[in-house]
Amino acid sequence: MFLLLAISGKLSRSRRPPRSPRTLLPMWSQREVIDYALQRRSNLQALRRPGRTLARQEACDADPMLIRAAKHHGEPSNVDCPVCESTDLVNLHYVFGDQLGQYSGRIKRTTELEEMAHEFGEFKVVVVEVCPACGWNHMILSYLLGDGVKRKPPRRQQTVEDIYG
C-alpha cells in the first residue's frame, strides 16, 4: 500500500498506518479466503446515496448480544466506523467446524487462532466488524484454517448449563 502511495506522489502525513478494514493475517494454513469488501461498499453507498435505498436502522441493526460480545471480546480495528466515524470499531473472529465439537460458534482472539490451526484439521473463521456506538455490523472476511488432518471432535465437557439446567 505504501508503494502505491509513493508512486502516485501522494504521501500521507498522518501518524497512523495506512487503513484497511481487512484482518487477513498471513497464517501458514489460511485458505479459501472470501473478502466481502464489495458487498460492504455497496451497502455503504446505498446508505449514503441521496435517494437512500437503505435506511440507517436497517444498516445499524446489530443484535444486543453482538454488541455485548464486541464490547467484551472484540479486537480493536485499525479503521473508524464507516457510519458514525467512531473509533470504537472492533473485529470479532467466530470459529465454526465439525472438528471443534462444542467449541464451534465461539469467539476467539487472533493468537488463539494460530494455536488452533495446529490443533484442528479444518475450521472456518468468520470475521465480523461491529461498532458498539451505532450498531453497524458487517461480515468482512471468512477463511479456512487448520492442518488438514481429519480428527474426531474433542470429548464433550460438562458445562454450567448441564449442571444447573
Each language-model region and where it sits:
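Short Cys/His-rich Zn2+-coordinating modules
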Residues: 56-71, 109-117
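N-terminal alpha-helical interaction blocks
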Residues: 24-64
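C-terminal/domain-terminus segments
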Residues: 28-34, 141-165
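Short recognition patches in nucleic-acid-associated and regulatory proteins
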Residues: 78-79, 85-121
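Short metal-coordination and nucleic-acid-contact micro-motifs, chiefly zinc-binding Cys/His arrays
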Residues: 74-78, 124-130
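Short, non-ligating residues that shape and space the ligands of small metal-coordination modules
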Residues: 87-91, 137-143
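N-terminal amphipathic/basic-hydrophobic helices that include classical n-h-c signal peptides
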Residues: 1-25
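Short cysteine-rich clusters marking metal-coordination/redox-active sites
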Residues: 81-84, 131-134
